[in-house]
């Protein structure tokens, strides 16, 4: 079966002769034009020959052939795919295969790839220069948008990645409280800084590593860990480390151990415990920020942390990160205060431009209702396909974020997630790839929908899932 929707889409009676289908080229165009399909398109064989050649060359140039481990397909097997272009809900590889994309550049592409308005705005900004190393007015605009949207943020500092945001916010929490220890949760990923690489999720979980060589013991000696959704374990840590804990940092919805939601009593309890013990609560919303709701997970759950990290969506697909929170805390950041942090490309005009135009689109009425609708349809459809074909599966969604596991469930923490049949997931992933659907190449990563995804995309994906599952 061809991975292009030109070939795979025959069952639905749709095809597209252009490089990208019309429904992929504009998020506002919700229709796919019915067209005739050539014999060549119908019989086109799925191949990754060019990807294989490119990847083999890359392995001599970059460690493992990639610049981020999960891209090497270590946990799913098969040939890593080398991508060429993307538009709307579609991504195309160098062999010409086109896929419905549920990775979305790992979250940023919430309005769809290569949005025309964002590209036009970037073109205008580039005429003025790509980076100044000095303040620009666009920083003010995006900062005002973030502050008005996110309940906890009264001041914000822009950086260049989610990792950098988490590094900065932890240093700030320690500076403000005068304490050194902090709590993170097993399977939660907060970037690759030394202090966080303890029982981490994301690519670390994908490779089956408890942590990373090269991290000094001293760097993690103040890192305390607890199982996610276990409030009793958190209380015990505070009891055993009285007056020493600066902060708790968590993904309010876990996306780096797969998709795991918090129990209501857990997230409420964390807020209470930090207040009672003079510790700060940090929400790592690099993934959930502007995705679960315009104000992020904190708006969705009605829990306001002291500090928040952001990334992905606020850069509209360009490298970006941010941390922000209460004014009295943020005023400790240099040059307003003594806590030093800096960056050559922080607040650069290109990332600010893409972020501004992405947030403008997300602020429109009906945005999150639409994301919720299509993601519900997708998640329920895949789980129903699993039920029909006799596979133990569980999963869930919130707005434009979803996930599923090959286990009976429920999944409340990383230890539950590890019960998933990862070998079966790998087979499912490879089968879906051949059917023209690109999922995250790891059982331990959440999936994402976008405003560019259509009902036809969702129905195609569900049909493909049932087809693949019936063969497993």
From Swiss-Prot:
**Co-factor(s):** pyridoxal 5'-phosphate
Q: Which reaction does it catalyse?
A: (S)-4-amino-5-oxopentanoate = 5-aminolevulinate
Instruction: Note one Pfam family from the annotation.
Output: Aminotran_3
EC number annotated for this UniProt entry: 5.4.3.8
Spell out the InterPro entries in the cross-references: 4pyrrol_synth_GluAld_NH2Trfase (IPR004639), Aminotrans_3 (IPR005814), Aminotrans_3_PPA_site (IPR049704), PyrdxlP-dep_Trfase (IPR015424), PyrdxlP-dep_Trfase_major (IPR015421), PyrdxlP-dep_Trfase_small (IPR015422)
One MF annotation (Gene Ontology) recorded for this entry: transaminase activity
Gene3D superfamilies in the record: Aspartate Aminotransferase, domain 1, Type I PLP-dependent aspartate aminotransferase-like (Major domain)
Q: In which pathway does it act?
A: Porphyrin-containing compound metabolism; protoporphyrin-IX biosynthesis; 5-aminolevulinate from L-glutamyl-tRNA(Glu): step 2/2; Porphyrin-containing compound metabolism; chlorophyll biosynthesis
> Which cell locations does it reside in?
Plastid, Chloroplast
Q: Give a brief account of the tissues where this protein occurs.
A: Expressed in leaf primordia and shoot apical meristems (SAM).
A GO term from the CC aspect? chloroplast
**Description of the deletion phenotype:** Suppresses partially the ENF1 disruption pleiotropic developmental phenotypes, including the suppression of the abnormal patterning of the adaxial-abaxial-related gene expression in leaf primordia.
Supply the enzyme class, top level. Answer: isomerase
Q: Where is the transit peptide?
A: 1-36
Quaternary structure (record): Homodimer.
- Its job: Transaminase converting glutamate 1-semialdehyde (GSA) to 5-aminolevulinate (ALA). Involved in the biosynthesis of tetrapyrroles.
The protein in question is named: Glutamate-1-semialdehyde 2,1-aminomutase 2, chloroplastic
In its UniProt entry, the species of origin is given as Arabidopsis thaliana
């Amino acid at each position: 079966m061809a991975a292009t929707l030109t070939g795979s889409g025959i069952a639905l009676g749709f095809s597209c002769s252009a490089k990208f289908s019309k429904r992929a080229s504009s998020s506002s165009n919700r229709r796919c034009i019915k067209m005739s399909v050539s014999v060549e398109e119908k019989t086109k064989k799925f191949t990754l020959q060019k990807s294989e050649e490119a990847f083999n060359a890359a392995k001599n140039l970059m460690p493992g052939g990639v610049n981020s481990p999960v891209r090497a397909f270590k946990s799913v097997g098969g040939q890593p795919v080398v991508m060429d272009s993307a538009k709307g809900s579609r991504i195309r590889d160098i062999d010409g295969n086109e896929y419905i994309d549920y990775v979305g550049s790992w979250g940023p592409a919430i309005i769809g790839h290569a949005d025309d308005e964002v590209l036009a705005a970037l073109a205008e900004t580039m005429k003025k220069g790509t980076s100044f190393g000095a303040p620009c007015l666009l920083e003010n605009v995006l900062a005002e948008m973030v502050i008005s949207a996110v309940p906890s943020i009264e001041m914000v500092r822009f950086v260049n990645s989610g990792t950098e945001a988490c590094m900065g916010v932890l240093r700030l929490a320690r500076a403000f409280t005068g304490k050194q220890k902090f709590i993170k949760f097993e399977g939660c990923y907060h970037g690759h800084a030394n202090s966080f690489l303890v029982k981490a999720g994301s690519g670390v979980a994908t490779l089956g590593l408890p942590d990373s060589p090269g991290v000094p013991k001293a760097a993690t000696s103040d890192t305390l860990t607890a199982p996610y959704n276990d409030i009793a374990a958190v209380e015990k840590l505070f009891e055993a480390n009285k007056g020493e804990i600066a902060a708790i940092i968590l993904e309010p919805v876990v996306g780096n151990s797969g998709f795991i939601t918090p129990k209501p009593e857990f997230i409420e309890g964390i807020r209470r415990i930090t207040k009672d013990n003079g510790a700060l609560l940090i929400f790592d919303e690099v993934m959930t920020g502007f995705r679960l709701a315009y104000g992020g997970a904190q708006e969705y759950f009605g829990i306001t942390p002291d500090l928040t990290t952001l990334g992905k969506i606020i850069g509209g697909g360009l490298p970006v990160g941010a941390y922000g929170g209460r004014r009295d805390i943020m005023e400790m950041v240099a040059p307003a205060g003594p806590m030093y942090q800096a960056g050559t490309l922080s607040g650069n005009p290109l990332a600010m431009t893409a972020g501004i135009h992405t947030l403008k689109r997300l602020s429109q009425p009906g945005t999150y209702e639409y994301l919720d609708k299509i993601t519900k349809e997708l998640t329920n459809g895949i789980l129903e396909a699993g039920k029909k074909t006799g596979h133990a599966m569980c999963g869930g969604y919130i707005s434009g974020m979803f996930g599923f596991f090959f286990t009976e469930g429920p999944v409340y923490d990383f230890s539950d997630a590890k019960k998933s049949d990862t070998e079966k997931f790998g087979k499912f992933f490879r089968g879906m790839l051949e059917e023209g659907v690109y999922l995250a190449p790891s059982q331990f990563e959440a999936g994402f929908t976008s405003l560019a995804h259509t009902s036809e995309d969702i129905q195609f994906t569900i049909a493909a899932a049932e087809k693949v599952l019936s063969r497993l």
